[in-house]
Amino acid sequence: MANTPSAKKAVRKIAARTEINKSRRSRVRTFVRKLEDALLSGDKQAAEVAFKAAEPELMRAASKGVMHKNTASRKVSRLAQRVKALKA
């Protein structure tokens, strides 16, 4: 248990940051899920639109420290491959 005032404040800050990160991670998952649905339905136009919406969300999460930048780049790359394969 946090005893010093600074430790108590740190606990509050960590709790607030955790909530923000959960929200950002959930938002990323939602955008990726919409893209997955578009890919599975085979709708090229919807997949393209969903990809253009999901990519900045992934990179924003990386820049905010929610996920590592290499993880975000890998996810973007793999999703782009799938969108490209759908268009071909």
UniProtKB/Swiss-Prot annotation:
Q: Does the keyword Protease apply?
A: no
Q: Where are the transmembrane segments?
A: none
Q: Note whether RNA-binding occurs among the keywords.
A: yes
Q: Which GO terms describe its cellular component?
A: cytosol; small ribosomal subunit
What GO biological process term is on the record, naming one? translation
Q: Name one GO molecular function term.
A: structural constituent of ribosome
Reading the lineage from the top rank, the first entry is: Bacteria
InterPro entries under this entry?
Ribosomal_bS20, Ribosomal_bS20_sf
Alphabetically ordered keywords of this record = Ribonucleoprotein, Ribosomal protein, RNA-binding, rRNA-binding
Q: Which Gene3D superfamilies does UniProt cross-reference here? A: Ribosomal protein S20
Pfam families assigned to the protein according to its UniProt record, in alphabetical order: Ribosomal_S20p (PF01649)
Q: Which PANTHER family match?
A: 30S RIBOSOMAL PROTEIN S20 (PTHR33398), SMALL RIBOSOMAL SUBUNIT PROTEIN BS20C (PTHR33398:SF1)
User: What job does the chain carry out?
Assistant: Binds directly to 16S ribosomal RNA.
Task: Tell me the protein family, please.
Answer: Belongs to the bacterial ribosomal protein bS20 family.
User: Known NCBIfam families for this protein?
Assistant: S20
Under what name is this protein listed?
Answer: Small ribosomal subunit protein bS20
